[in-house]
Amino acid sequence: IEQKPLVYSYLVDESADEVVAGNASMALVYSGEAAYAESLSKDLDYSVPEEGSNMWIDSWLIAKTCKHQENAEKFLDFLCREDIAMKNFEYVYYATPNKAVYDKLDKETQENKTIFPDDETLNNCEIFRYLDEDSIALYNKLWKELKSK
């Protein structure tokens, strides 16, 4: 709570826009937003703290109870098509798991550590796990306290 007067705002998805606009000096952002912001301003740089950070994976799945499994599979096939996967990459700036798309990227993009972090960085990160109910309750209590002051 003592830091609150020093913080521009507590945001997630809008943070990169605020830095690009010059309203904030730094922000906690996802790597895709950082890569997008860097494309707008060469004065910006993305870094992962030496202590590490979290990793995330956006995933698609088909539920066992899906009533239109064939269409769901067609949709996933569509997303995996090279041309569509390339459009998705160009829009979101997140690393692509599609090797054909990666191979078509220019060398500078392939070597961009914001988009494609090296093994040393990834080995120092972890995937967040679901919290138990007590932890969620504590998190919500502390967040409400922070936002209300």
Where are these regions (language model features)?
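Extracytoplasmic/periplasmic, Sec-exported soluble proteins
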Residues: 7, 11, 51-54, 63-68, ...
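Mature extracytoplasmic/periplasmic domains
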Residues: 63-123
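Non-transmembrane alpha-helical segments in soluble domains
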Residues: 16, 20, 28, 73-80, ...
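Conserved C-terminal helix/tail region of periplasmic/extracytoplasmic solute-binding proteins
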Residues: 119-149
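Solvent-exposed loop/turn segments at secondary-structure junctions
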Residues: 32-35, 52-54, 67, 81-85
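Ligand-binding pocket segment of bilobal, Venus flytrap-like solute-binding proteins
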Residues: 1-49
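Periplasmic-binding protein-like
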Residues: 1-2, 40-66, 110-111
